[in-house]
């Protein structure tokens, strides 16, 4: 079901000489709904902030997240998961294939988003990233979803699971 498991990871992106940012990504395994946020550092505090944003912006409740064993997903991040009632699954070291959906999503960000000229200031970059994600979640066809965008797929699944009226 939507929100049953969200994979989360970070990606270091070089925007130019001496300009790197930390890109936090999340993808729902059922709908492929994705969210991302950029920060200057990949530490527990930005990771916890990203999780809080995900909880608010996801169109369904988040029940569990899966992360690699990176230090950014310890302490503050673990506390936020516990406080929000979100199960946390931490993968063993050096097992990126177990986080394959978010790893693939990060490749999509590299290929489709980070190949264009982008601002190096975090607020402006986040605005561009949010616009890309809006397109990704609402309009971009996904082969794994039979050509639907994640939010189209979610709407279809919700319609199919809605109670049917038996009145004539």
Label the model's feature ranges.
Residues 1-27, 33, 46-49, 60-62, ...:
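Mobile-element integrase/transposase regions
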Residues 2-4, 75, 84, 95, ...:
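C-terminal domain-tail junction helix/linker
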Residues 9, 32, 65-68, 99, ...:
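Short, conserved catalytic/metal-binding motifs centered on acidic residues
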Residues 33-37, 89-91, 115:
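Short small-residue beta-strand/loop micro-motif enriched in glycine and branched aliphatics
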Residues 42, 60-75, 94, 148-151:
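Acidic/histidine-rich, metal-coordinating catalytic segments
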Residues 54-59:
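Phosphate/pyrophosphate-binding loops at sites that engage ATP/ADP/AMP, CoA/4′-phosphopantetheine
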Residues 64-69, 83-101, 117-122:
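RNase H-like polynucleotidyl transferase catalytic core
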Residues 77-79:
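Short amphipathic alpha-helical segments
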């Amino acid at each position: 079901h939507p929100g049953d498991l969200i994979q989360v990871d970070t990606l270091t992106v070089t925007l130019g000489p001496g300009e790197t940012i930390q890109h936090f990504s999340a993808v729902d395994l059922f709908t492929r709904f994705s969210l991302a946020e950029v920060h200057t550092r990949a530490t527990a505090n930005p990771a916890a902030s990203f999780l809080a944003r995900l909880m608010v912006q996801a169109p369904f409740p988040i029940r569990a997240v899966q992360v690699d064993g990176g230090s950014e997903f310890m302490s503050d991040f673990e506390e936020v998961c516990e406080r929000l009632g979100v199960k946390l699954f931490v993968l063993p070291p050096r097992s990126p294939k177990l986080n394959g959906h978010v790893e693939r999503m990060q490749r999509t960000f590299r290929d489709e988003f980070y190949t264009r000229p982008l601002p190096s200031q975090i607020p402006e970059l986040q605005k561009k990233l949010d616009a890309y994600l809006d397109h990704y979640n609402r309009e971009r066809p996904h082969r794994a979803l039979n050509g639907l965008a994640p939010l189209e797929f979610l709407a279809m699944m919700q319609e199919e699971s809605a109670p049917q009226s038996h009145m004539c």
